[in-house]
């Protein structure tokens, strides 16, 4: 989700957030995808129109005389929308936008001291705010001329995106992210709607029927009569989220709930509903989605009014029941549905909406209750009904405290060491009493004490743990592990540590031909559910993370466990060529008769990879991942770790001091024939130092490949007598 730093800061009134918040977010376990200024606008001013007249020397230009805090200015424009007394915005001489500095110019006999601006010329997408891209005319009481335009229009904002794990879906909202930061900074969390109460004016005639949803889900309605309004600032916030605000303000309200609380809600035009009965169930047939897009769905979770479908649950509304600019009586639906069925809805209509993106993961009943309060506060000046089909929240889940387990995971630290972390968790609605821990109702992912430990460690900060020497003894190996790593570091590789567990998709990556991935019975999240079949898929994730941080030249290595308790080593590089990577690998095993064969494994790039064999036993692979599985411009070599340590491979041979010679051999290959059998033949005849391809002459049905073989004189004689017979 994308966030506005200024709006997030409104929940934390006693501190000022800045770019350093990225460190806090990453410390809390949230990966920052990007963090950037919202607008490049500099020096923008509010301006009052003093006079407007057409340039007598031009049929297109209009001269606008303005009053600003810098004094009076004259600016010419072709966009003739301003009148005397209007409040607008302008770039004076010396200000800039997108790196362009504005200068004073003379046009058709009149000076122009800057530029008047529209939404699109200060950083916003005008199509989300207005029907026409024209000079901005503001309400006359919106600002004074002395106000900071960048502050008032929230241009001096930062926009950032977080990558959220599937088990923390609630963080896709300002409310819950702000709570995390309030605990992290130990500062006040402020929320104007949190104490809102329902001011009921009438009893709704609508009812919810049916038992399709079990007790883990909810479906509630709130009826409202009157005019809903959206503030200018709220429209700007929605625009930052790429959300159109040119609809009935009631629709804008549903989107404000979406981004603030992370829960999709829906609104219906009461006048278009033919029944007082609502229900939920599966639907098969055609529906007319918002935007007049007709689709046919199968087993889609739908909301019914009587026997008529009025929306696809938490996915998209329908044209027949939508609110328009004339609607004055509204039915707001606030609900939580089975996420699996919402994912099916998105699949059926072949698109993901903002609503389905959130509801395809768990939405808690606690969030539904928060949505009630948000509406109670926002609609307090309207006539409101009772909440139809309201419910009581369940009791908090209780987990037994386990001191011994905490010390085991923290390397002997007592619970007293985590006092500050306990206090921070209390700010997040965790309760600690009588060796029991009560879990907040929105934390559906916390169910065992190990989850509590993870929360404690997050707020204790992993940097506070003292580093302990890491000793890894793979199996029965007792050779010099440190020497192996030092050699790789000398070759320019940095050691990486990745998770042994991966998600279901990545677990299918099996270039080593091991076996079906092992699925854990209990797991922290869907991202860490299976034991990996390859180190390369984990290093690929590390490479991608580096690329997101604009680190494009990466050389990594890892030694670790894969499926079946096997230890492998893997090198990953975006900086070296295939031959350079191969040479780095071969440099460890100079005395081995390794073979590089065309890959048969479906996960390897067929034209840019090879499988590594020794005595007909597959030891690993080198090259790229098949782009049909993962499109990543990165080379890998992955091999059995014990290959480096096995003494039978450590044979010493006295160096041959003879001067090396070379011979050129040419072989004719059919167009679909591989070169490997000729390489095998050369290696069986003589012990060569190097083989290089120097030419490849194409013919209609075949091609001639010329190889240059370098070897000691005696070996060259063997090749000459074998291949160059009269």
UniProtKB/Swiss-Prot annotation:
GO terms for molecular function: ATP binding; magnesium ion binding; phenylalanine-tRNA ligase activity; tRNA binding. GO terms for biological process: phenylalanyl-tRNA aminoacylation. It is an enzyme of class 6 (ligase). Residues 394-467 form the B5 domain. The keyword tRNA-binding applies. It is found in: Cytoplasm. Its EC number is 6.1.1.20. Pfam families: B3_4, B5, tRNA_synthFbeta. Binds 2 magnesium ions per tetramer. Signal peptide: none annotated. One of its GO terms (cellular component) is phenylalanine-tRNA ligase complex. SUPFAM superfamilies: Class II aaRS and biotin synthetases, Nucleic acid-binding proteins, PheT/TilS domain, Putative DNA-binding domain. Its cofactor is Mg(2+). Residues 38-150 form the tRNA-binding domain. Keywords: Aminoacyl-tRNA synthetase, ATP-binding, Cytoplasm, Ligase, Magnesium, Metal-binding, Nucleotide-binding, Protein biosynthesis, RNA-binding, tRNA-binding. Mg(2+) binds at residues 445, 451, 454-455. It catalyses: tRNA(Phe) + L-phenylalanine + ATP = L-phenylalanyl-tRNA(Phe) + AMP + diphosphate + H(+). Tetramer of two alpha and two beta subunits. Belongs to the phenylalanyl-tRNA synthetase beta subunit family. Type 1 subfamily. This is Phenylalanine--tRNA ligase beta subunit. It comes from Mycoplasmopsis synoviae (strain 53) (Mycoplasma synoviae). The lineage of its organism: Bacteria, Bacillati, Mycoplasmatota, Mycoplasmoidales, Metamycoplasmataceae. The gene is pheT.
